[in-house]
Amino acid sequence: ALGNIPQPPYPRVSALRLDGVPWKYPLVPLKLGVFQEIRDNIIKEDPYPAHGWFIFRQNPVNSLPERRKTIEAFNKLDFIVTVDISMNDTAWFSDVVLPEATYLERYDPLAVVDDTIFIRQPVVEPMYESKPGLWIFKELGQRLGLGDYFQYEDEEDYLRQQLAPLGITLEELKAKGYYRPPATEEAAGTELVFNTPSGKIELYSSTLANSGFQPVPIWEEPVTNEANTFFLLTGKVAQHTQFATHNNKLLHERVPTNPMWIHPNPAGERGIADGDDIWVESAGGRVKAVAHVTEKIRPDCVYMTPGFGHVSKGLVTAYGQGTSDSDLHLTFTDPVSGSQALSQTTVKVEKVSS
């Protein structure tokens, strides 16, 4: 196993978490949380008024449903800090932006996939005033009087401390790019077990039952959309990563916008042809999009790629390009996992009149 960076114990926090874990979502792991719940609880001031938000490698203005609510939450805060590689939509609304170096300019903490350790190492120096995340947080910690929680000299020292129990050097790992420990034989009689109380596959989940949820799957009638509406579907494309790469000129040339897919039958009923401007409206908002008429979509659904419709003028290439699905999606949160259900929103579609 990788070594840990020495730290003193964290102080005990008695206040409830803003994301509802575990007081509202008892089964959601503490390290994951429920992102959209932070936004909603800031607005409701539940369980207390919030004053600031420190955001790292997240973009709630573009990634959360109901963008108007996210901006409403921001307006209730006194101070917002964003650490990111670009002036994304969330950074645009922040009081302070700390520019992070990109993955080509920094080390990251070592990652383990199955039994193999991989290293990400810089190939060029950071540009302008950007700094690696490990540097940013160490500097912040020291300036806040919390330097004991960041006991490493620099990025390479951080990685060396991680490697210490394995008996290999950082130079060896950098040269090879990965490390796989020697194979070992399993002890006789050792069996693989599942991460359940019984160690077996559980058709009846005592974990769910003890938290007040249905312990077995139950039948629920499928949600149906109202007449003249469509389920709004979204899905990523291979050319872009999450919401972070749309300002990259090379990737933008390949996927510059996000037309809305609609089946020929409902499109014909509405007089919509491929390439027409259309209005798309949900209970959350109304946006203009471009129609892509195709049989690759169900007649009761429409589809669009997320990550477009940026409002930050700092994104000189991506600003104003395409349509934001965040202006349409409503917030549906699974009570067990805390995940967002992004296929429940229904929309109306009509052609833009000339």
Predicted regions and their residues:
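Catalytic alpha/beta core of large soluble enzyme barrels
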Residues: L98-P99, T323
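Residue-identity detector for glutamine
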Residues: Q7, Q36, Q58, Q121, ...
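Extended redox/cofactor-interaction regions of prokaryotic respiratory oxidoreductases
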Residues: A1-W92, T102-D108, V123, K174-K176, ...
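Catalytic, metal-anchored helix/loop core of enzyme active sites in primary metabolism
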Residues: D95
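Long, contiguous, secondary-structure-rich segments that constitute the structural scaffold
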Residues: M127, G133-G177, L250-M260, P266-S354
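Short strand-coil-strand connectors
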Residues: F118, T190, P197, E281-G285
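Glycine/threonine-rich phosphate-binding loop and adjacent beta-strand/alpha-helix elements that clamp
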Residues: L104-P126, F137, G141
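A signal for specific C-terminal beta-sheet/loop modules enriched in small/flexible residues
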Residues: E100, P217-P222, C301-G309
